[in-house]
């Protein structure tokens, strides 16, 4: 139990549904895609599959030159070790990469050999450097130029065939225009579409449309083939008993709704089925066919208008009377009767079989393959010479060439599935059979026999993860390299070159750098807190290259779709124009090898719910009946109800229990990580839940983190998977602990049985991407036993291994003097005084000393025209000291820059002669603390170019780093040495000495006391007469020496890396980075929020004595507006408040019992045990309570007295009755309301108020970072007006309405000053400055620039306005008149 308390927090779980499968690692989406699927790291070369990087290289190589004299083949690829680790890359501003070495084999062929294949003259194999490839960190991110970035997964339309219609928008009558589109993974798009006249067309790459029959004939089909493929035939046979009658097959699908013109007679029985004038429909015809009607009798004239299925030939002369597909007319019918033709085959057209293909065929001017190919060529390449061979080659290259057209396995699966084909998955080109079947299905859809696709169905959308995105970039780069190699082979003497001479790696690295640096999907990682990191990694974007455009994305794409269930979160998405386009993966969802999102379900076999978990994609799910997770089950996991509500094919249906195929794993699987952290989510309005999920990601990590009293149970999972906490890599025992590192002796045995040593260096006060503070705190003590995966150190915004974004504070829902108006938040002074919502932010400031054309810039303390007060924080080198408290305007790093010579006056010459020349030659270009920053310098990093002399500060920093490395080296060696000595002693005890050493003589029997007197060196030299023991000792000594040599080598290489200097950008000599920690206390203007979308701004910090307080004297921490609840419908916050209130009061009750125990009442332990078991009833912890002794129980209760922590999972959490039960156990009112006393008057409020503990967050919208004040500052070069915005240190806009306000009060001089001197009167500014210097209070405004602009505009309208200046006397004379 102590182990449990020290590593994990005990939570009372209200969940009813047992989880049979754990939550999959939350960042495996990224890691699997890049490391396993793309790079195949850790896979032996011989075992690599043909995918990812291996697949791309196999598809590009071998490369043949144009004349067949050489072949360049791919053999294998390998990666070098990264030059720097992740931390070093972040510190130095480098990318975390590894060199890609590809082994290529150049096969030189004999040109003179005319045989095929040619004789090989020689083979040259070489490993060629192909550039540096970014590696993924353990947290699923990339380090590019020193900053962590995330490559977001992209949702896009899956390759395959899609059938759609235009919703009647194209045609004025609202007629549906059907179309089909074949989308390959790579290559040309192929479209098929109907027009308003029901003719069928095709397009390639959205070029001009052509008749679809042109394509079919170009693919080798004749008119006869086309008609026979797309239409069934019906045979009319002459009825022998009547000259005017025919027998024909009865086909219901050819029947159209109409009134019969003649009797419908069964040909076999002669029975009249329907009389003339009766109505016939497809349904009636189907019923007749089902009853056994096979053939019917029709009159002679029924053949008129039918279309021939084969040529109508005069049997006597062989003459073709009517061609295939042509219409039978009365004249033709007369000829048929005259020639006594007894059998006529016609196309089965009519009713539900439209003549679209036939009509298109007869309007198509192209009648053979040659003309069809030429027609297609002219459309695709207008203006070029069209030949049959060129036309055939173009069509083949566009649609049937593997190098240019690729459906991918996904596309082939989709096409096979949609068209019911069985083509091999390796055939990733479109086939003629595909095209024929697509047209046939499109015609069927037009005829109403099939349905169009739902493009928003997740079976039609897939995810391109980071590995696939980078693979596509690799393909682009390697195609460029392949072209370069072909050109290069043709321009060199092939016998004299090696593969390295043929490759230009920059063509690949430039593409990769561009993608990681500037792509819309490669994003600056959101590092505000652990949740924001994990959410960013799990984000799905429909935007980006090959995706949607946010300006044109329709509502349907953004909307929630039934197939999102368990795959994409319906709640978490941004507010604003990206809503619905950027989504988050559901918490249990996985992405399969084809890029489709899968959700987990438990299999149900004959009503019994098994523990087998099956992941289903959206397409697979539609075929099964899936019950809800909260469906009633009996004790042996069988369905109780006879009828069960299930999801089937996108709808909710009631099915028999024995027909159920699957059941949801957990109700939580619907939502994302952030949404699943909102307790009582089911009681919140979806819009507010969206805000709550989004605002948790904006929570600033606090100085003192606290896990939520009311959680959902996944807080520890999020903290662990985000990588912000430190988890033990192996089982072991903690050897050493300090604030910066943990040393663990692992139980994993290495060679000779020696233990391993894990050293965990903690991150201390590092800056994140968003300037928040990354700091890790130790949780373990020396001697603690740790298991693999245990949290041994808390990270940013975590507490005891659980994510902790805010604080549990006592809130009251009351109105308080209007200070809670419009969601404002009233805060007690205690919150500020005790640093409850204080956060540390770290600013990074950088100074670069460059080599200029006038000479090098110098970092120095000797700065011209700067007094000693300004230099007080600098050391002798000119760099600020760590620990200095700095404010705006202070110098952080002194730097002087050489300036060009200007003409020197005699006075300056004299001054130079007296004071020396240095001051005149340089100007101050130091690094100053920018406006709005006041804090403490916590770190300084100095980087110097290789080869230049290092200053004292640089050397001191290097010594500190080396000292830390040596300490790690000594500690790791000490653990191994200790094991070695102990093990050697164990082996030698009881043995006979075989050599004399110190006080030991040959033949002495060795005991522990004798061995303890020897030094470590002597002990390792001692020999015994037992050879097997000596062999084992030799093995241990050998392992020790080998390990020491390895550690020494590693230490030396690390020290060399530190001392060798840095790779700096061109022209930079030194770079100094200064990190300033800024403490932000809570103050009016800061934004705060709960987890339910309840947000507000701090309006006032009120003294504790004025705040409302409880009857026991407890002062309320925060006052919230009760009116913020009804309209927002986020009732979850009230339930959370009540449950938090119960938790704290239960803790207080346990605390009183513990105090009673310590005061001497030792008999109360049974009562405590009984009470604690009552709280944790129906939880596994209740059984543990029975197993601990009294002392351990009291230790547990000491932890619990701070408050009982609850877990209320999403959709399966605490009900009202559960909350009331907890309130009752805590001996507080079941209503959750108390009587509050007004701190100002000491009187009770009129009625009872809702008071309780709510988890509130401080968001990353701090007033200190929003508001600034300008006195003087920069002006725009064009308008000469002050700039705007904090980043430009701009002013506040004084607009038209503000001018009206001053005009209304007659403040003429104030208005004049604002519109001239303080705005754009350059002359007025200078005069004011001069007047202030002279101590004169009379200011002259001058003419503003905006007036000159207006005059120029009026002149453009031919109105010449001139400003005239009159003397004062003239003005007086004018007044006298």
Swiss-Prot record:
Keywords: DNA-directed RNA polymerase, Nucleotidyltransferase, Transcription, Transferase. GO terms for biological process: DNA-templated transcription. It comes from the Bacteria. It holds the Pfam family RNA_pol_Rpb2_2. GO terms for cellular component: DNA-directed RNA polymerase complex. It is an enzyme of class 2 (transferase). It catalyses: RNA(n) + a ribonucleoside 5'-triphosphate = RNA(n+1) + diphosphate. Its EC number is 2.7.7.6. InterPro entries: DNA-dir_RNA_pol_bsu_ext_1_sf, DNA-dir_RNA_pol_bsu_external_1, DNA-dir_RNA_pol_su2, DNA-dir_RNAP_su2_dom, DNA-dir_RNAP_su2_hyb_sf, RNA_pol_bsu_bac, RNA_pol_bsu_CS, RNA_pol_bsu_protrusion. One of its GO terms (molecular function) is ribonucleoside binding. Belongs to the RNA polymerase beta chain family. DNA-dependent RNA polymerase catalyzes the transcription of DNA into RNA using the four ribonucleoside triphosphates as substrates. HAMAP family: RNApol_bact_RpoB. The RNAP catalytic core consists of 2 alpha, 1 beta, 1 beta' and 1 omega subunit. When a sigma factor is associated with the core the holoenzyme is formed, which can initiate transcription. This is DNA-directed RNA polymerase subunit beta. It comes from Orientia tsutsugamushi (strain Boryong).
């Amino acid at each position: 139990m102590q182990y449990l308390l020290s590593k994990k927090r005990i939570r009372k779980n209200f969940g009813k549904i047992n989880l049979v499968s754990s939550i999959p690692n939350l960042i495996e989406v990224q890691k699997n895609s890049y490391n396993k699927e793309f790079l195949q790291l850790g896979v032996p070369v011989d075992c690599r599959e043909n995918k990812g990087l291996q697949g791309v290289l196999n598809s590009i190589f071998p490369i043949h030159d144009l004349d067949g004299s050489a072949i360049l083949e791919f053999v294998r690829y390998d990666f070098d070790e990264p030059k720097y680790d992740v931390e070093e890359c972040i510190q130095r501003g480098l990318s975390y990469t590894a060199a890609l070495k590809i082994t290529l084999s150049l096969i030189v062929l004999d040109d003179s050999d005319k045989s095929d294949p040619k004789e090989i003259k020689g083979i040259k194999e070489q490993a060629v450097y192909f550039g540096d490839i970014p590696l993924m960190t353990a947290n699923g991110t990339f380090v590019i130029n020193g900053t962590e970035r995330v490559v977001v997964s992209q949702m896009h339309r899956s390759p395959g065939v899609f059938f759609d219609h235009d919703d009647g928008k194209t045609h004025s009558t609202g007629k549906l225009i059907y179309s089909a589109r074949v989308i390959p993974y790579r290559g040309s798009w192929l479209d098929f579409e109907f027009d308003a006249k029901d003719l069928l067309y095709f397009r390639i790459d959205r070029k001009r449309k052509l008749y679809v029959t042109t394509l079919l004939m170009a693919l080798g089909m004749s008119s006869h083939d086309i008609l026979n493929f797309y239409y069934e035939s019906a045979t009319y046979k002459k009825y022998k008993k009547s000259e005017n009658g025919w027998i024909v097959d009865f086909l219901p699908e050819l029947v159209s709704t109409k009134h019969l013109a003649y009797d419908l007679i069964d040909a076999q029985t002669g029975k009249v089925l329907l009389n003339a004038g009766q109505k016939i429909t497809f349904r009636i015809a189907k019923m007749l066919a089902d009853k056994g009607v096979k053939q019917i009798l029709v009159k002679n004239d029924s053949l008129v208008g039918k279309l021939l299925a084969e040529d109508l030939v005069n049997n006597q002369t062989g003459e073709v009377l009517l061609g295939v597909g042509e219409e039978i007319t009365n004249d033709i019918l007369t000829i048929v009767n005259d020639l006594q033709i007894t059998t006529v085959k016609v196309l089965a057209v009519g009713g539900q079989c439209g003549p679209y293909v036939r009509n298109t065929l007869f309007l198509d001017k192209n009648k053979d393959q040659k003309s069809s190919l030429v027609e297609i060529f002219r459309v695709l390449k207008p203006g070029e010479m069209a030949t049959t061979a060129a036309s055939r080659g173009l069509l083949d290259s566009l649609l049937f060439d593997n190098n240019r057209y690729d459906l991918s396995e996904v596309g082939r699966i989709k096409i096979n599935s949609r068209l019911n084909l069985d083509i091999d998955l390796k055939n990733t080109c479109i086939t003629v059979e595909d095209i024929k079947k697509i047209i046939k299905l499109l015609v069927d859809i037009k005829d109403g026999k099939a349905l169009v696709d739902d493009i928003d169905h997740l079976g039609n959308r897939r995810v391109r993860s980071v590995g696939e995105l980078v693979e596509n970039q690799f393909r682009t780069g390697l195609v460029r390299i392949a072209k370069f190699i072909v050109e290069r082979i043709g321009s060199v003497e092939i016998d004299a070159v090696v593969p390295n001479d043929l490759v230009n790696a920059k063509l690949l690295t430039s593409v990769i750098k561009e993608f990681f640096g500037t792509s819309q999907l490669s994003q600056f990682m959101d590092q505000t807190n652990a949740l924001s990191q994990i959410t960013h990694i799990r984000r799905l974007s429909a935007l980006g290259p090959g995706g949607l455009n946010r300006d044109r994305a329709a509502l349907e794409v953004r909307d929630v779709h039934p197939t999102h269930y368990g795959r994409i979160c319906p709640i978490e998405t941004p507010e604003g124009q990206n809503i619905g386009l950027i989504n988050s993966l559901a918490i249990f969802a996985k992405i399969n090898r084809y890029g489709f999102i899968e959700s987990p379900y438990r299999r149900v076999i004959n009503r019994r719910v098994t523990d087998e978990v099956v992941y289903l994609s959206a397409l697979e799910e539609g075929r099964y009946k899936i019950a809800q997770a909260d469906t009633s089950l009996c004790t042996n996991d069988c369905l109780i109800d006879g009828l069960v509500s299930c999801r089937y094919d996108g709808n909710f249906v009631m099915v028999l229990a024995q027909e159920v195929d699957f059941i949801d794993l957990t109700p939580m699987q619907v939502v994302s990580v952030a949404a699943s952290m909102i307790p009582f989510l089911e009681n919140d309005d979806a819009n507010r839940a969206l805000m709550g999920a989004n605002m948790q990601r904006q929570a600033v990590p606090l100085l003192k983190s606290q896990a939520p009293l009311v959680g959902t149970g996944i807080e520890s999972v999020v903290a662990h998977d985000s990588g912000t906490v430190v988890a033990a890599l192996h089982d072991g025992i903690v050897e050493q602990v300090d604030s910066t590192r943990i040393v663990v002796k692992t139980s994993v045995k290495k060679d000779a049985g020696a233990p391993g040593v894990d050293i965990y260096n903690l991150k201390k006060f590092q800056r994140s991407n968003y300037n928040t503070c990354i700091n890790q705190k130790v949780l373990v003590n020396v001697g603690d036993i740790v298991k693999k995966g245990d949290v041994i150190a808390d990270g940013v915004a975590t507490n005891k291994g659980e994510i902790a974004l805010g604080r549990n504070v006592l809130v009251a829902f009351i109105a308080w003097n209007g200070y809670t108006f419009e969601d404002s938040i009233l805060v007690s002074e205690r919150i500020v005084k005790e640093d409850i919502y204080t956060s540390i932010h770290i600013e990074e400031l950088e100074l670069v000393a460059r080599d200029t054309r006038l000479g090098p810039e110098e970092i120095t303390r000797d700065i011209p025209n700067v007094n000693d007060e300004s230099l007080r924080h600098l050391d002798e080198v000119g760099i600020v000291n760590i620990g200095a408290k700095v404010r705006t305007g202070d110098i952080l790093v002194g730097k002087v820059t050489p300036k060009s010579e200007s003409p020197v006056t005699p006075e300056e010459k004299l001054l130079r002669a007296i004071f020396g020349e240095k001051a005149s030659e340089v100007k101050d270009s130091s690094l100053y603390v920018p406006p709005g920053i006041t804090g403490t310098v916590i770190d300084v990093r100095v980087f110097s170019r290789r080869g230049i002399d290092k200053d004292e500060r640089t050397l001191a920093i290097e010594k500190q780093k080396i000292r830390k490395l040596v300490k790690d080296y000594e500690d790791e060696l000490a653990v191994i040495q200790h094991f070695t000595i102990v093990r050697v002693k164990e082996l030698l005890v009881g043995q006979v000495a075989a050599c004399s050493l110190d006080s030991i003589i040959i033949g002495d029997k060795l005991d522990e006391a004798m061995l303890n007197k020897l030094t470590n060196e002597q002990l390792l030299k001692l020999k015994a007469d037992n050879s097997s023991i000596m062999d084992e000792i030799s093995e241990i000594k050998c392992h020790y020496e080998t390990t020491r040599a390895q550690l020494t080598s590693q230490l030396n290489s690390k020290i060399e890396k530190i001392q060798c200097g840095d790779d700096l950008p061109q022209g930079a000599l030194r770079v100094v980075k200064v990190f300033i920690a800024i403490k932000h206390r809570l103050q009016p203007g800061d934004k705060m929020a709960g987890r339910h979308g309840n947000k507000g701004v701090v309006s006032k910090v009120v003294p504790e004595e004025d705040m409302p307080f409880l009857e026991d004297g407890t002062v309320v921490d925060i006052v919230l507006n009760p009116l913020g609840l009804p309209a927002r419908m986020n009732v979850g916050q009230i339930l959370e408040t009540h449950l938090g209130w119960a938790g704290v009061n239960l803790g207080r009750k346990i605390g009183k019992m513990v105090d009673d125990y310590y005061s001497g009442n030792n008999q109360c332990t049974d009562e405590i045990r009984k009470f604690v078991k009552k709280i944790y009833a129906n939880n596994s912890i209740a059984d543990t309570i029975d197993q601990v002794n009294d002392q351990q129980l009291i230790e547990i209760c000491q932890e619990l007295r701070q408050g009982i922590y609850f877990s209320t999972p999403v959709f399966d959490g605490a009900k009202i009755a559960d909350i009331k039960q907890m309130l009752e156990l805590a001996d507080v009112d079941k209503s959750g309301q108390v009587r509050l006393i007004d701190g100002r008057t000491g009187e009770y409020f009129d009625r009872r108020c809702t008071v309780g503990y709510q988890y509130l967050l401080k968001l990353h919208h701090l007033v200190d970072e929003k508001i600034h004040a300008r006195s003087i500052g920069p002006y725009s070069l064009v308008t000469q007006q002050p700039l705007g915005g904090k980043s430009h240190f701009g002013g506040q806009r004084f607009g038209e309405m503000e001018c009206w306000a001053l005009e209304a009060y007659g403040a003429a001089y104030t208005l004049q000053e604002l519109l001239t001197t303080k705005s754009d009167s350059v002359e007025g500014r200078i005069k004011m400055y001069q007047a202030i210097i002279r101590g004169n209070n009379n200011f002259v405004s001058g003419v503003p620039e905006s007036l000159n602009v207006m005059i120029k505009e009026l002149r453009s309208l031919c109105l010449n306005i001139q400003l005239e200046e009159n003397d004062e006397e003239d003005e007086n004379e004018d007044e006298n008149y």
